[in-house]
């Protein structure tokens, strides 16, 4: 029995308030949620999986773009209608604390992105009848391996936050205002948490921060991602994946570290945002000298087996049909494995909010659909190349009715990419060799087989 199970089973908890936590938004928000759950359980609160039976409902909100805000507000209003005592946490709380407290009387507390570690004290104050505004403008906190954490992901998968905040100022992005400046964890702290997760049986470790490739710059005076990759390569976890790499941060030193670390997956998440120099310049992104083309070509040469994921924004202010055609040609030329496409969301407080030549919403949606249609064909072609190959698959779910497994190969990251549907023997949380028998645009299908000679469990 682990510490959480022990805490949840003690009789004293029967008198403690029950708390449910709803997580919205990205993986960074998920880690905050997991730390709040861990702190609450350690303090003796009953953590419920269902908000209906909870005394308090904590909603860890997202405020990255308009659609995320709408989802967060909709969730809060549904709970308010039910008469729940709500604690609003996360990015929406950081962004709009006064408005939320004014408009949602059911909110007994509000907790900012730099204050989630005080969740126990916040609830204690709310229990005494205080309406709590725990939002600080001093965004300098980052949890380490000593802070209790209860993972909400599938058992074999864990996110590992290496840094928090961002020092870049992309003209469309509100994140630096919501999360503060970059603050990296020491390598030793990250390695200790990785060892803890390995001891829990984690099979896939996913490195995250706002700009993962800038890891260590604030702490050591220079990026230390290459050193971190090599150090994590010594941890007994079969798969290590990295998300949120800034294009110019994939330096030759980082590429060399990836090449030399067998359990580091050949999967690169590079949010490029656009291809046309004029739009990139307006976004305050790297834009000179075909920087993105050169990067992709260099990566294809150095890491020919690498899976490339990227994301783009369409409908940025001033984007013309010529600019958009440039983006279509860029995607066609580079044949990315996975692409996410967002329509520009004007965020108050960012430079792009005031730019002229705002693109009409219907045109944004049309361009998004055209780009996604192009990428669907590319993704299907990429997936069809997998048919006949034997690849490692991490089994994450089982369909009890059919006996079919649902898992992922190294080419698929959780939540954002596809899955592999697997038939054959296996166990939950295990890695198995699977021969791919069929492909769809976003998913694969296969059968468990014997591992061939020289089989790579990281898919290299």
From Swiss-Prot:
Its EC number is 2.8.4.4. One of its GO terms (cellular component) is cytosol. Keywords: 4Fe-4S, Cytoplasm, Iron, Iron-sulfur, Metal-binding, S-adenosyl-L-methionine, Transferase. Residues 152-381 form the Radical SAM core domain. It comes from the Bacteria. Belongs to the methylthiotransferase family. RimO subfamily. Residues 17-128 form the MTTase N-terminal domain. It comes from Synechococcus sp. (strain JA-3-3Ab) (Cyanobacteria bacterium Yellowstone A-Prime). It is found in: Cytoplasm. This is Ribosomal protein uS12 methylthiotransferase RimO. The gene is rimO. Catalyzes the methylthiolation of an aspartic acid residue of ribosomal protein uS12. It catalyses: L-aspartate(89)-[ribosomal protein uS12]-hydrogen + (sulfur carrier)-SH + AH2 + 2 S-adenosyl-L-methionine = 3-methylsulfanyl-L-aspartate(89)-[ribosomal protein uS12]-hydrogen + (sulfur carrier)-H + 5'-deoxyadenosine + L-methionine + A + S-adenosyl-L-homocysteine + 2 H(+). Transmembrane segments: none annotated. [4Fe-4S] cluster 1 binds at residues 26, 62, 91. Residues 384-450 form the TRAM domain. Gene3D superfamilies: Methylthiotransferase, N-terminal domain, Nucleic acid-binding proteins, tm_1862 like domain. It is an enzyme of class 2 (transferase). GO terms for molecular function: 4 iron, 4 sulfur cluster binding; aspartic acid methylthiotransferase activity; metal ion binding; protein methylthiotransferase activity. One of its GO terms (biological process) is tRNA modification. Its main location: cytoplasm.
């Amino acid at each position: 029995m682990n510490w959480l199970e022990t805490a949840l089973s003690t009789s004293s908890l029967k008198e403690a308030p029950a708390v449910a936590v709803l997580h919205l938004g990205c993986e960074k928000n998920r880690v905050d949620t997991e730390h709040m759950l861990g702190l609450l359980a350690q303090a003796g609160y009953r953590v419920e999986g269902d908000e209906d039976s909870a005394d308090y409902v904590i909603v860890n909100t997202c405020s990255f773009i308009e659609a995320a805000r709408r989802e967060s507000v909709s969730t809060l209003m549904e709970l308010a209608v039910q008469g729940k005592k709500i604690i609003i946490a996360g990015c929406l709380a950081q962004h709009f604390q006064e408005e939320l407290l004014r408009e949602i009387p059911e909110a007994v507390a509000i907790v900012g992105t730099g204050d989630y570690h005080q969740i126990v004290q916040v609830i204690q104050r709310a229990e005494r009848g205080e309406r709590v505004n725990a939002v600080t403008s001093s965004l300098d906190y980052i949890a380490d391996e000593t802070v209790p954490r209860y993972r909400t992901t599938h058992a074999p998968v864990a996110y590992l936050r290496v840094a928090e905040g961002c020092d870049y100022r992309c003209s469309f992005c509100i994140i630096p205002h919501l999360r503060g400046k970059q603050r990296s964890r020491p390598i030793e702290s990250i390695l200790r948490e990785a060892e803890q997760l390995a001891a829990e049986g984690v099979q896939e470790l996913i490195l995250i921060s706002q700009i993962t490739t800038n890891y260590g710059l604030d702490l050591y005076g220079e990026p230390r991602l290459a050193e971190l990759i090599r150090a994590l390569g010594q941890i007994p976890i079969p798969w290590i994946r990295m998300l949120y790499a800034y294009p110019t941060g994939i330096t030759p030193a980082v590429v060399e570290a990836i090449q030399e670390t067998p359990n580091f997956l050949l999967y690169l998440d590079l949010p490029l945002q656009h291809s046309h120099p004029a739009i990139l310049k307006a976004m305050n992104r790297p834009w000179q000298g075909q920087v993105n083309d050169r990067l992709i070509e260099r990566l294809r040469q150095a890491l020919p087996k690498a899976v490339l994921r990227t994301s783009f924004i369409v409908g940025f202010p001033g984007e013309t049909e010529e600019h958009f055609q440039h983006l279509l040609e860029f995607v066609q030329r580079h044949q990315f494995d996975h692409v996410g496409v967002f329509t520009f969301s004007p965020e108050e407080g960012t430079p792009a909010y005031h730019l002229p030549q705002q693109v009409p919403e219907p045109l944004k949606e049309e361009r998004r659909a055209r780009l996604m249609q192009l990428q669907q064909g590319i993704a299907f072609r990429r997936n069809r190349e997998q048919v006949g190959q034997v690849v490692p698959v991490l089994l994450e779910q089982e369909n009890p009715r059919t006996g079919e497994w649902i898992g992922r190969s190294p080419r698929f990251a959780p939540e954002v990419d596809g899955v592999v549907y697997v038939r054959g023997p296996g166990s939950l949380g295990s890695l198995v060799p699977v021969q791919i028998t069929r492909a769809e645009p976003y998913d694969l299908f296969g059968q468990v087989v014997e591992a061939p000679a020289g089989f790579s469990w990281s898919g290299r």
